[in-house]
Amino acid sequence: MEGSKTSSSTMQVSFVCQRCSQPLKLDTSFKILDRVTIQELTAPLLATAQLKPGETQEEEANSGEEPFIETRQDGVSRRFIPPARMMSTESANSFTLIGEASDGGTMENLSRRLKVTGDLFDIMSGQTDVDHPLCEECTDTLLDQLDTQLNVTENECQNYKRCLEILEQMNEDDSEQLGLELKELALEEERLIQELEDVEKNRKIVAENLEKVQAEAERLDQEEAQYQREYSEFKRQQLELDDELKSVENQMRYAQMQLDKLKKTNVFNATFHIWHSGQFGTINNFRLGRLPSVPVEWNEINAAWGQTVLLLHALANKMGLKFQRYRLVPYGNHSYLESLTDKSKELPLYCSGGLRFFWDNKFDHAMVAFLDCVQQFKEEVEKGETRFCLPYRMDVEKGKIEDTGGSGGSYSIKTQFNSEEQWTKALKFMLTNLKWGLAWVSSQFYNK
């Protein structure tokens, strides 16, 4: 409630408001308190608070002669309470007045004054429900509240007075009637109390049922939350499975499209592309033959022969044809024919050129043997298709191919004692016959 601040040789004491805690500056009158002022400040609100028990009874007896005094026209009864200063001045709350010290306010006088002021505020706080000291604003607020309470109390007093007047006007009959009504009301009260007890019992039962229902509702909420989590998980899995299903369906559609495309694709035509490049017949862009003006590398010629052997071997397997006298062995650019009469005899369909090429006739024998296999393929096709005819007739014994539709000349498939131009043309005619055979096999076995 009080604080202190030390500065050099003096001490300034300040108090704070007990409501807003703001620092207060005390009025100068606190420095010159006399005995009467102190008694007025410390006196209780009611005079009976200072009386002894015997004196209180005597006061009450004396006051019974004139309990109410009409002082205003508003009908409010008031009792006169003598002020505390009219009572004995020798009370426990008396103070010893402190004057100014001769030395201008020593620390001892300041401490005594602080103690007197603090005790004064404590006594004032003990006499009422309000703690002291208060600032001016809080005091105004407190006064407003007290005025409001006073108005409410005055209104209550007026209401009590009106009720008293009504009671005084009632006669004895009304009293008897009121007694009967009172008994009826007492019975009604007992009945209502019984109903209240029944309602209370029902309330307890309902409260127990409510607790059970709330527990069940909480359990259902937990189950609902669990079901919601499971539903969300299943929904996520469903979405993932839907995505996978759509992906699989797209893959199936793509695979079906590729399958339909493959079904429509001629495997032989796609694998073996026979065409021509100038005077050369080509298979898969490999030229078969050579000219003085265009010396094709033997590696390319050997690769073309490898593709040609592979084509005839595939056509024969498709038809189920077994060649007589020779067996085709596709082996890339080192393909050859194997003699069935002499297993150790191999006829190579590849050559490296050089001087050995002119004296070694195995390459020529291999090309004639291959022409024999083409002739066997033609004869096998003619057994089932009499109208089938190749554009160039082949003479296996001489190893030549005749240009029946053109000049009518014959061209040897051998290299010895033959020009490169005629050899290249014979190979071109042979590839043309194979192209016709490939087209026939594709037409016959396309849907098989």
Swiss-Prot record:
Residues 110-157 are annotated as: Interaction with BCL2. GO terms for molecular function: phosphatidylinositol 3-kinase binding; protein-macromolecule adaptor activity. The modification N-acetylmethionine is found at residue 1. It is found in: Cytoplasm; Golgi apparatus, trans-Golgi network membrane; Endosome membrane; Endoplasmic reticulum membrane. The keyword Cytoplasm applies. It comes from the Eukaryota. Transmembrane segments: none annotated. The modification Phosphoserine is found at residues 14, 29, 88, 91, 94. Gene3D superfamilies: 6.10.250.3110, Autophagy protein 6/Beclin 1 (1.10.418.40). GO terms for biological process: apoptotic process; autophagosome assembly; autophagy; cell division; cellular response to glucose starvation; cellular response to nitrogen starvation; defense response to virus; early endosome to late endosome transport. It is a peripheral membrane protein. A motif (BH3) lies at residues 106-125. The keyword Coiled coil applies. Keywords: Acetylation, Antiviral defense, Apoptosis, Autophagy, Cell cycle, Cell division, Coiled coil, Cytoplasm, Cytoplasmic vesicle, Endoplasmic reticulum, Endosome, Golgi apparatus, Isopeptide bond, Membrane, Mitochondrion, Nucleus, Phosphoprotein, Ubl conjugation. Residues 140-267 form a coiled coil. Residues 243-448 are annotated as: Evolutionary conserved domain (ECD). Residues 423-448 are annotated as: Required for membrane-association. One of its GO terms (cellular component) is Golgi apparatus. There is a cross-link at residues 400, 435 (Glycyl lysine isopeptide (Lys-Gly) (interchain with G-Cter in ubiquitin)). The C-terminal evolutionary conserved domain (ECD) contains poly-Gln-binding domains such as the ATXN3 poly-Gln motif, consistent with structural docking models revealing two highly scored poly-Gln-binding pockets in the ECD. As some binding is observed with BECN1 lacking the ECD, other domains of BECN1 may also interact with ATXN3. Plays a central role in autophagy. Acts as a core subunit of the PI3K complex that mediates formation of phosphatidylinositol 3-phosphate; different complex forms are believed to play a role in multiple membrane trafficking pathways: PI3KC3-C1 is involved in initiation of autophagosomes and PI3KC3-C2 in maturation of autophagosomes and endocytosis. Involved in regulation of degradative endocytic trafficking and required for the abscission step in cytokinesis, probably in the context of PI3KC3-C2. Essential for the formation of PI3KC3-C2 but not PI3KC3-C1 PI3K complex forms. A homodimeric form is proposed to exist; this metastable form readily transits to ATG14- or UVRAG-containing complexes with BECN1:UVRAG being more stable than BECN1:ATG14. Component of the PI3K (PI3KC3/PI3K-III/class III phosphatidylinositol 3-kinase) complex the core of which is composed of the catalytic subunit PIK3C3, the regulatory subunit PIK3R4 and BECN1 associating with additional regulatory/auxiliary subunits to form alternative complex forms. This is Beclin-1. It comes from Bos taurus (Bovine).
